[in-house]
C-alpha cells in the first residue's frame, strides 16, 4: 500500500486560517488484502505541527506504507528525517518527473504547484471514482469507499481553489503514489548479421 499527506508547517497558535492536515492510506492491488481501497483517513489540526507529524509517522509505521507528501511544506519531511524514518517518504513518482529538473532525485515528496501534478492529481481521483466508488458499470462490481468526509470533499472540490480541500489533496496524492510507472520498451538494435560471424566457404581446387 501507499499513503498521501497534505501537511502544514505553522502551529495553530500562529496560523488562524483553520486549514487541517490530512492523511490517507490506500491499498494497491493485492491478492492478500482488500485491493484498490482507502483503509485509513485522518484529518486534524493539533496545536503543534509536530503532533500532526508524529500522528502521521505512527500511521505510516503501523501500516508499513510509504507516503507521498506535498513538499511545498517541508516541515514534515524534516521531521521524518530527524526521527530516522526518511525511507517512509516517497520521492516524486517517475511518471510525474520533469525531464530537465535537477531536483527530481534530491528532494523527497512532490510539489503541489505544478500544473502537470495538479492535472494528474484531479484525473487520478476522477478515475478512482469512476472505477471504484459505487457500482462499476463495466464490471458490475461494487467499490468500497467508507469515508464520507472524503466523499463530501471530493464533491465540493474546486481545482482552481484547492486550499481548503485537505482530504482531497491527501487522497489524490495516495492515488498518485499508487500508480504504476510504465516504462517504454527500447527498440532493440540487435542485428543478426553483425552478431553472427559468417564465413565464406572457400572452394579449393
Segments from the language model and where they lie:
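RNase H-like, metal-dependent nuclease domains and their acidic two-metal-ion catalytic environment used
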Residues: 1-92, 131-205
